[in-house]
A protein has these predicted regions:
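Binding/recognition "hotspot" determinant
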Residues: 1-535
C-alpha cells in the first residue's frame, strides 16, 4: 500500500556507450616467373580506417507484486512502464494518473574510408611489356536510431481506477473486473520507430600501357570507375495496448478517447463518456535510397573502348493503420454528445450504440502505400580507329516497380442484436453494422457511403543487347546486304535481342457500408441516403 501526495514509479536506466576505431596500412609486393618465362611483378600500398560509436539506453521497469491487494492513493500517480501484479485487487485513487510507456533506444554512427595505390608490370617474351598504375579511394558514413516501446501493465483479479485525469499506454488485465472511473481518459498507442541515413562513394582510376622498347612505342589504356550511394528514411509502428477482463467498464464525465487500444471482455464491455472516440493505431514509412555507378575503359592490347553506367532509385511513402477491436458478449458504447469510431471492429451478441444528443460517426481509416523502385543500366563497347569510336556491342536494362495502393481499415461491427440511437445525424462511411436484428432512432439524417479499395501495382522489366557493326548498304549493294542480314538474323549488320516483361495488378473493390440486418426497424427522422461506389 502506498499513500502519498505524489507517487512516482520510474524506470532504472542503463546507459552504455562504446567507441571503436581502426587504422590499417598494408604493403604488398609480389613477383613471379613461370616455366614459360612469363614474368610479373606487382606492388600495392593500401590504407583504411574507420570509427563506430554505439550508444544505448535500456529501461528496467519498477515491479510491484502482492499476493493479495495493491493499493495506491495519491493526488498524482506517475507510472513509467510500471508492472503491477496482484492476486486479488489492484486499487488506484488519485486526482490524476499517468500510465506511460518508455522506449529502449539504440543509436549507431559509423564512418569508414580508405585509399590505395598500386603498380604492376608483366611480360611473356621480354619484348613487350604491360605496365599499369592504379589509385582508389572510398568513403562510407551511416547513422541509425532505433526505439522500441516498453509498456507498463496492471494484472490482478480485479482492477479499480478512480481518478480525475487518466492517461494510459499500458495493458490492463483482470481475470474478473476492470472498472475505470475518471473525469476524462485518454488511452493511446505506444510507438516503436527507426531512422537511418548515410551514403558514400568509391572511385578507382587505372592507367597503363603496352610498351615495345625495340620499336619505341607504347599503346596506352585507361580504366575508370565511380560509384556513389545515399539513403535517408524513417518509420514508425503502432504498439497497441489492451484492456481485458471478464467485465470491462470505462466511464468518464468528460471525453473518453481510445486510440490504438483494444477492449476484450468475456461478458460485458461498457464504454461511456460525454463524448466517446475510438480510433485505430497509426503507422508510417518514408524512405529514399539512390545509387549511381559508372565506368570507362580504353584497352591497350587492341584499339577499343567501353562505357557502362547504372542508376537505382527506391522511394516509399506510406501511411497505414493498425485496427483495434472492442469485443464482448455485450458491448455498449454510450455518450452524451457523440460517438466516433474509426478503424474499429467488434464481435458481440448484443450491441448498444448510443450517441446521446450528438452524432454517430462510423468511418474507415485510409491506408496509402506508395512505392517506386527504378533500376537502369547501360553498357557499350566498340573499337577506335582513325580517332573515331564505333560501337560494336552493347546491352541495357530497365526495371520499374510502382505500387500505388489506397485501401481502408474499415469499422465493422458484427452482432446478433443491435440498438442504434443518435440525437443528431448518423453516418456510415466505409463502415457497417451487421446484425440479425437492429432497432433504434436516428433523429437527424442517416447517410451510408461505400469507399473504394484501389490496388495498382505495375512491374516492367526490359532487357536488350546487341552486337555487330552498323553497315548502311550503298544502292548497288542493297540486295547483297539484305541477303546477309537474312542469313545472319541482323539488321544493317547489327544483331539485337530484347525481352520485355510487364506485370500489372489493378483491382478495385468496395467497402461495406450502412446497416445490414435481417430485420431493420431503425427509425430515421431525417433523410436517409446511400452512395454506392462507382466503377
Amino acid at each position: 500500500q502506498e499513500n502519498a501526495k505524489e507517487v512516482l514509479h520510474t524506470t532504472a536506466k542503463n546507459s552504455t556507450n562504446s567507441f571503436g576505431n581502426n587504422v590499417n596500412v598494408d604493403l604488398t609486393v609480389s613477383a613471379s616467373i613461370d616455366k614459360s618465362k612469363a614474368f610479373s611483378v606487382e606492388a600495392e600500398l593500401a590504407a583504411k580506417g574507420g570509427r563506430e560509436t554505439v550508444s544505448s539506453i535500456t529501461h528496467t521497469a519498477t515491479q510491484l507484486q502482492a499476493g493479495k491487494n495493491i493499493s495506491v492513493n495519491a493526488n498524482h500517480i506517475q507510472d513509467n512502464a510500471t508492472q503491477y501484479s496482484a492476486g486479488e485487487t489492484a486499487q488506484f485513487n488519485s486526482s490524476s494518473h499517468q500510465l506511460v510507456a518508455v522506449a529502449n533506444r539504440v543509436e549507431k554512427n559509423s564512418l569508414s574510408a580508405g585509399a590505395s595505390l598500386g603498380v604492376s608490370a608483366d611480360t611473356t617474351d621480354f619484348q613487350r611489356f604491360n605496365v599499369a598504375a592504379k589509385v582508389g579511394a572510398n568513403y562510407n558514413q551511416s547513422a541509425s536510431q532505433e526505439s522500441n516501446a516498453v509498456q507498463g501493465s496492471i494484472n490482478a483479479k480485479n482492477v479499480n481506477i478512480h481518478t480525475g485525469k487518466f492517461n494510459s499506454q499500458a495493458n490492463i488485465n483482470a481475470s474478473e473486473n476492470v472498472n475505470i472511473q475518471a473525469q476524462s481518459a485518454q488511452f493511446s498507442q505506444a510507438t516503436s520507430s527507426k531512422t537511418q541515413s548515410g551514403g558514400g562513394f568509391e572511385a578507382k582510376v587505372g592507367v597503363g600501357a603496352m610498351v615495345v622498347p625495340s620499336a619505341g612505342a607504347a599503346v596506352p589504356s585507361i580504366d575508370l570507375s565511380l560509384s556513389a550511394n545515399g539513403k535517408n528514411g524513417n518509420q514508425s509502428q503502432a504498439v497497441t495496448n489492451t484492456i481485458a477482463g471478464k467485465n470491462v467498464n470505462v466511464q468518464t464525465q468528460g471525453v473518453l478517447n481510445l486510440q490504438g487500444t483494444n477492449v476484450q471482455a468475456v461478458e460485458n464491455a461498457q464504454l461511456s463518456g460525454k463524448r466517446v472516440n475510438i480510433t485505430a493505431g497509426n503507422n508510417h514509412v518514408q524512405n529514399v535510397a539512390a545509387s549511381v555507378a559508372t565506368g570507362v575503359n580504353i584497352g591497350a592490347k587492341v584499339a577499343n573502348a567501353g562505357f557502362n553506367a547504372n542508376v537505382g532509385v527506391n522511394t516509399e511513402n506510406s501511411q497505414t493503420h493498425t485496427g483495434v477491436a472492442v469485443n464482448g458478449k455485450n458491448v455498449s458504447i454510450q455518450a452524451q454528445n457523440g460517438v466516433n469510431l474509426k478503424g474499429v471492429t467488434s464481435t458481440s451478441e448484443q450491441l448498444n450504440l448510443n450517441a446521446g444528443k450528438g452524432n454517430l460517426a462510423l468511418t474507415a481509416a485510409t491506408d496509402s502505400v506508395n512505392k517506386t523502385d527504378v533500376s537502369v543500366g547501360l553498357k557499350l563497347g566498340g573499337g577506335v580507329a582513325e580517332q573515331k569510336w564505333t560501337p560494336s556491342s552493347g546491352s541495357g536494362h530497365l526495371a520499374v516497380n510502382v505500387v500505388r495502393n489506397e485501401t481502408h481499415t474499415e469499422t465493422t461491427l458484427n452482432t446478433d442484436t443491435a440498438k442504434i440511437n443518435a440525437g443528431g445525424d448518423a453516418k456510415f462511411i466505409g463502415s457497417s453494422v451487421n446484425a440479425n436484428h437492429v432497432s433504434g432512432t436516428i433523429s437527424g439524417d442517416s447517410h451510408s457511403e461505400q469507399l473504394a479499395n484501389k490496388v495498382n501495382e505495375v512491374s516492367v522489366s526490359l532487357a536488350a543487347n546487341g552486337s555487330g557493326k552498323l553497315a548502311v548498304p550503298t544502292t548497288d549493294k542493297w540486295a547483297e546486304a539484305a541477303k546477309n542480314d537474312w542469313n545472319n538474323g541482323s539488321i544493317a549488320g547489327v544483331k539485337a535481342d530484347a525481352k520485355l516483361e510487364v506485370n500489372a495488378k489493378h483491382q478495385q473493390t468496395a467497402t461495406n457500408a450502412g446497416v445490414n440486418a435481417t430485420q431493420d426497424t431503425v427509425v430515421v427522422k431525417g433523410v436517409k441516403s446511400r452512395t454506392e461506389m462507382k466503377n
